[in-house]
Design a protein with these regions (language model features):
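Membrane-water interface segments at the C-terminal ends of transmembrane alpha-helices
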Residues: 23-29, 74-76, 140-171, 199-205
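Short membrane-interfacial helix/loop motifs at transmembrane-helix boundaries
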Residues: 56-96, 167
Length: 331
């Protein structure tokens, strides 16, 4: 088992290095010059002052050295925990900007992923043994899982936010409030959070429900299920075994779909102007903030890889066949 986890850890480290390298390269191939943008913001008329300021910013951000040296400097700073300084919010460190945005993204992602996975699996399992639920879940589930996150977010904002007027459609809390621990502010947080969360939850819920429904039907027709029924085992016991076996592909599916759900969360934040990492990325692209883009993508890459590694560990714990295979391979 240790050898298995060592191989997995090495694979994830190589993936991390490759992803971070691509992340570092993309902003540098984007059109535009962020240093020129910062100099233009100063509105200087003296050519010597403009040249001096441009030289200062170029040296400050390390853009005056060869590209390979910039790459090595990036990794050196990364190992020190230094993500650089935001060009857009100069001189605020990128880390400080991310710390303000990450909690909003996690507040959307974690509940949406966990609740949609559990609720979708339970509902799909129930639909597999109920004709009425099956006729209801299947078409609705297909519609939900085929709906783009952005389109569903716009639809929810229009229907529940504009037409009905129940929920706000922009921001993380009311612009008239200051962040405090008061009930008024917390309620405003929840009201602004609900529509982005619902967009993520519904799309993911449909996919998990359909997947579990199909897996339960497949497992109930397997040889072991027929054998148990021929022995007179209660139908409830057969379904319990079928549910346990059907959960394994769903755990694998969670690892495979994690990147899609995270991408959906970033797009949803943009739709609702929700101040998470996704909305931050949009703003960083608009102002050509290389270092903020690098920091935001680094958080996403690291988060997805860590979550996938945890899911791998859970899969080994849940599936005894995996542990048996590891012992056999070791022997």
């Amino acid at each position: 088992m240790r050898q298995y986890f060592r191989r997995k850890l090495l694979l994830y480290l190589l993936t991390f290095v490759a992803a971070v390298t691509i992340n570092w390269m993309i902003p540098r191939f984007m059109p535009g010059d962020p240093v020129q943008s910062m100099v233009a913001r100063a509105r200087l008329e003296n050519p010597e002052a403009v040249a001096a300021l441009q030289s200062y910013y170029t040296n400050l951000f390390g853009l005056d050295v060869p590209i390979w040296q910039q790459y090595l400097n990036f990794w050196g700073a990364l190992f020190r925990g230094d993500l650089g300084v935001s060009i857009w919010l100069f001189p605020t460190p990128v880390w400080d900007v991310l710390v303000r945005a990450v909690p909003y993204t996690l507040a959307l992602l974690v509940p949406a992923i966990v609740l949609s996975w559990f609720a979708g699996n339970k509902f799909g399992a129930a639909a597999a043994r109920s004709k009425w639920l099956d006729n209801t879940v299947l078409p609705i589930g297909y519609i939900l899982t085929a709906t783009p996150y952005m389109w569903l977010g716009i639809l929810l904002a229009w229907s529940l936010g504009i037409v009905v007027g129940i929920f706000p459609v922009a921001g993380a809390y009311s612009f008239a409030l200051q962040p405090t621990w008061s009930l008024t502010f917390l309620w405003s947080l929840v009201m602004h959070w609900f529509l982005p969360f619902l967009s993520l939850f519904l799309v993911a819920f449909g996919g998990w429900a359909i997947g579990m429904r199909n897996m339960i039907i497949y497992e109930l027709e397997a040889d072991y299920a027929n054998y148990l029924e021929s022995l007179g085992a209660p139908r409830r016991l057969v379904r319990r075994y079928a549910f346990r076996n059907a959960m394994l592909p769903q755990i694998t599916g969670l690892a495979l779909q994690l990147g899609t759900i995270v991408a959906g969360a970033l797009v949803t934040e943009i739709v609702f102007s929700y101040p998470g990492v996704g909305y931050l990325i949009l703003q960083a692209i608009q102002v050509q903030d290389f270092f903020l883009l690098q920091g935001a993508f680094l958080f996403i890459v690291a988060g997805v890889l860590i979550a996938n590694f945890v899911i791998d560990i859970v899969y080994v714990i849940v599936d005894p066949r995996t542990r048996t295979g590891m012992r056999g391979a070791t022997a």
